[in-house]
């Protein structure tokens, strides 16, 4: 059902769907909703298995029979369209390795970016697993959750005491994001409000109209 749902949504949206997958950080809630209760190791196994299964059930081809440790299907015809990209928010080494082997994108989580210890210690695990599986590590894109304010005037400091991005003027945003792409290999950014603030339509509008086009233009010229 998951494979059918996401491939249908991808087709209807013109390819604007991304499937986010995780190993399950809330086992009690998953069990309450009828899901299997896995140990942490089993959850990572199931996570990797289901990503492979979703991909195999898309893009046409012969009927799929799968007898895995956690999932089984018999003679299911793949959807006639490709599966959407699968992104994960893996944290532990085993799930990071699974991301490298089978996923298409990785979000470090906790607003981590290329300056963070989380990124510096985790991305090599993804890359090593991808290479060991015969993949080009660059196939696994890094996409960042980027919180922060968009201010009218430049800020004296654009990062907090822990080195996390907190925002700045449009020019400061453009400089930071462009550096992330051109110098550190980032593939995309997701803007969200800092802290627990509500979504701000004005900020999202400025992001879409002023920041994103400027970053794309610079990357296209220099990339």
Placement of each model-derived feature along the sequence:
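Active-site-adjacent structural elements that line small-molecule/cofactor binding pockets in enzymes
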Residues: 1-223
